[in-house]
Amino acid sequence: MLEIRYADEVLRTLRRLNKRNLIRHKIEELAADPKSLRSNVTRLQGRPESRLRVQDWRVIYRIEGNILWIDNILPRGSAYEVN
């Protein structure tokens, strides 16, 4: 199982969301077995991160060693804009 670490901004966003329990559950599933949610996971082109689809939300994450870094949680439309 991977250790989950959230960016500070992600924690603030997560507290405001109605679907926070569902999103946290999916993140925990991903940490337990990164291959279990394969159909909802896609590697982002030209970036080191991947995305996890949770209904209309996108969880942007990366795995470094034994750590699952949650970099951002965004609504579907703005998840793929280049920063």
Please report, for each region that a protein language model flagged, where it lies by residue.
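Enriched for short, Lys/Arg-rich terminal
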Residues: 1-4, 9-17, 22-24, 31, ...
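A short, surface-exposed loop/turn module that caps and links secondary-structure elements
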Residues: 28-53, 80
